[in-house]
Amino acid sequence: EEGLDVITLNKLKLSDATAPNLEQWNNFLEQHKNPKSEIKIGLIGKYVELQDSYKSILESFIHAGAENKVKVKVISIHSEYINTGNIAEKLKGLHGIVVAPGFGERGIEGKIEAVRYARENKLPYLGICLGMQMAVIEYARNVLHLEGANSTEMNQDTPHPVIDLMDEQKSITNKGGTMRLGAWECDLEKNSIVWGVYNSENIEERHRHRYEYNDEYRTQLEEAGLKATGINPKTGLVEIVEIPTHPWFVGVQYHPEYKSTVANPHPLFVAFVKAALDHSENN
C-alpha cells in the first residue's frame, strides 16, 4: 500500500519484473486468520523450555491448521515431569499427542507414558523420529510384555533391544559416521494409514538419526498389532509403524516437519490435524 515494493524494484532496476501471484499466500492468510474451530495438541518433548527447539514442528502445525481451517493450539509438555500418577491430569483436554524428536535417555520414560496414554485412550498420535522409537518400546513393554524392552541408546544391556544400531554401525567409533542423514526412499504398504495420507506407494523423506527399528522383533510386534507400513526399499529398514485398529496412530523415523511449507503443508501433519479435529468433534 505504501509503494515500497515499487521503490525497491526501481532501485534494483527490476521495474519490468512480473508481479508475483499472491493468491496462494492470501488464501493461507485468510484461512489462518479465520479458523472455524480450535484443537489442542500436546507436544511432548524434553527441550520445551527452548521454544525454537521444535520450531519446524510448530510451523508445520500452522500450515496444517490453515489447510484444515482450524486453529492448532500446541501445548508444550516436558516429558521429564510426566509419570503414571499424573499423566491423566497432564494430558487432559488434548485432542492429539505428538512425541517429539530428541537424543539421549533423559525424559524418555515420560514419552513412553504419553505413547501409552494415546494408545489406550484412542487419542490421535504422531511420533517423530525418537517418538516413533518410543512407540515401538511402549508396545513391546505393555502389549508384548517384554519386560525391560528399550533402545540400546538408553540401555546397552536391555534384554530386548527393540531399537538398536544396525550391525554395520556397531564397529564405527566416530558417532557422526553412524548417523543416517538426508533424503531416503520409503515404500508404503497399500491400504495403510500412511498410504492414504500420501496417496502414493513411494515417498522420499529427510532423516537425522542413529538408531533403528530392530527387525528381529518385527514379527512379534506385527502379530500383536503394531504394523510396519513403511520400508526403505534398499536397506529393508522400517521407517513407519502404525496401529490399524486405532483411530489414528502413526510413528515415523524421519522428519516430516523439514518439508512442510505454507504452499505445501506436509500431508502427515494435515492428516494428523484432521484426525485430532475429528476426535474433538466426536468425543
Regions found by a protein language model. Name each.
Residues E1-N202, H207-T245, Q253-N283:
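N-terminal beta1-alpha1 cap of cysteine-dependent amidohydrolase-like domains
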